[in-house]
Amino acid sequence: MELTPREKDKLMLFTAGLVAERRLNRGLKLNYPEAVALISCAIMEGARDGRTVADLMNYGRTVLTADQVMEGVPEMVHNVQVECTFPDGTKLVSIHEPIV
């Protein structure tokens, strides 16, 4: 199977999101890369489900709470940007202050 660099990046991000989700389900607090991966993965899946950019920008702020991440992580994550494919093309989804 041949994958483009973009497809490889998406696959790696999705894998990191799955690892983060499993750790969260086990009751572990997520670190910075895990938190960003989980939020990004949720946004990509939402785009695949047909949600709008505006809806995903709001949804991205509900994926994680400060209690679910390690101390200091909410202050480190100011913005998460994910390039997603929508029915009308590729768009950049930005989530500002995603962990409340």
Curated annotation (Swiss-Prot):
The keyword Hydrolase applies. It is found in: Cytoplasm. It comes from the Bacteria. Its main location: cytoplasm. GO terms for biological process: urea catabolic process. GO terms for molecular function: nickel cation binding; urease activity. It catalyses: urea + 2 H2O + H(+) = hydrogencarbonate + 2 NH4(+). Its EC number is 3.5.1.5. Pathway: Nitrogen metabolism; urea degradation; CO(2) and NH(3) from urea (urease route): step 1/1. Keywords: Cytoplasm, Hydrolase. CDD domains: Urease_gamma. One of its GO terms (cellular component) is cytoplasm. Pfam families: Urease_gamma (PF00547). Gene3D superfamilies: Urease, gamma-like subunit. PANTHER family: UREASE. Heterotrimer of UreA (gamma), UreB (beta) and UreC (alpha) subunits. Three heterotrimers associate to form the active enzyme. Belongs to the urease gamma subunit family. This is Urease subunit gamma. It comes from Shewanella halifaxensis (strain HAW-EB4).
